[in-house]
């Protein structure tokens, strides 16, 4: 798979994740927020709570599923990016970190994942 195809698959997975989460009642704030030290796939709100969401996609579980694809380093970068985002936007509210894992057609939403 070329890098362009990989990016397209990733974008499609994020689109599926967003549609799924909106069906669950979450509201999109921003997507693909990038800093030199980390990226946030989706930033959403549920009431007054801010939710930072990592989306992981795997075509199949043959080489490990989407859940296994989240490393400690990725979690640390997401935490740092979310903290920076909240400071930059002067947000003083509760937040949580969720993981939305997509393996083929299966979607698994883990709230308070890390």
From Swiss-Prot:
UniProt lineage: Bacteria, Pseudomonadati, Pseudomonadota, Gammaproteobacteria, Alteromonadales
Family: Belongs to the UPF0102 family.
Protein name: UPF0102 protein Shew_0226
Top-level taxon: Bacteria
NCBIfam families to which the protein is assigned, alphabetical: PRK12497.1-3 (NF009150), YraN family protein (TIGR00252)
InterPro entries in the cross-refs: Restrct_endonuc-II-like (IPR011335), tRNA_endonuc-like_dom_sf (IPR011856), UPF0102_YraN-like (IPR003509)
Annotated source species: Shewanella loihica (strain ATCC BAA-1088 / PV-4)
A Pfam family matched in the record: UPF0102
GO-annotated molecular function: nucleic acid binding
């Amino acid at each position: 798979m070329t890098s362009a195809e990989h990016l397209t698959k990733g974008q499609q997975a994020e689109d599926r994740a967003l549609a799924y989460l909106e069906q669950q009642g979450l509201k999109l704030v921003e997507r693909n927020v990038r800093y030199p030290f980390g990226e946030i796939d989706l930033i959403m709100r549920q009431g007054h709570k801010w939710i930072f969401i990592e989306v992981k996609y795997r075509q199949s579980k043959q080489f490990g599923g989407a859940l296994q694809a989240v490393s400690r380093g990725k979690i640390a970068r997401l935490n740092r990016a979310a903290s920076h985002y909240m400071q930059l936007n002067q947000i003083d509210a509760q937040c949580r970190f969720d993981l939305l894992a997509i393996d083929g057609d299966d979607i698994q939403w883990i709230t308070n994942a890390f």
